[in-house]
Amino acid sequence: MNKVSFQGVPGAYSESAAKKFFGEEIDAYGTDSFEDALNAADTKNSSDDYHCILPVENSIEGTVGQSIDAITNTNLHSIGEVYLKVEHCLIGRGKLDDVTKVYSHPQALGQCSDFIEDHDLKTVPTYDTAGSVEIIKDLEDNCAAIASSLASRLYDVPIIKEGIANNSNNFTRFLIFSRENTTESGNDKTSIIFSVKHEPGALNQILKEFNDNDINLTKIESRPNKNTNWEYNFFVDFVGHFSNDKIQLVLKNISKNVLFLKIIGSYPIADLD
């Protein structure tokens, strides 16, 4: 049975994504932070069937920055991706007119900002969507949470209103991590992180390498470098597997013009369904 660590508590969207990727029969383990989730799968006692799953991108709110920062420092390799349709519910013991305060993860609060504004609700950020249901279950009726219907069932707190996201076409992309690498499938994506010198044309030189070798970039995102003010790391996804000869040559050329380069991993491209 696959063991999967994730950030959050039972009922979190990450747990649902893990079950979508591995199947319902998994040994899921919730942690307090993205770093803890990665570390749980990277201990000496972790077996080959121990994985970690992290959200990296949402179709409405964009990149999950804390997750990307944690990935920068892990020794694990990304071996898969999965897309999960996110269907937010307002959960609480009161009626909609009773609710004045709503608890949830900042990403979920952002994804439901129109509903929150329309009902003039005060927001309380929490570390996890499902965890917010656990928090409000014993609070007054004016307190509610934004989470999944699964969290409502697990913590036995009623759904006040379903489908409260700004956009019903709301998907979150997750990456799956392991101590082992993957082999080339023929339909792969690779994720890397790098930092360039703070000088004119430095980033363009890297991007030109991809362009000259006809490699399709599917994502590029900058994140502040935590060690040096006003310098940035770049998180990049591109089509292809790092074991491919052409990809290896490009990565070798890139490595000559960056301050650091980390290959997060290569994995089969997931369908958006």
Ranges and model annotations:
Residues 1-273:
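Domain-level signature for soluble enzymes in the chorismate/prephenate branch of the shikimate pathway
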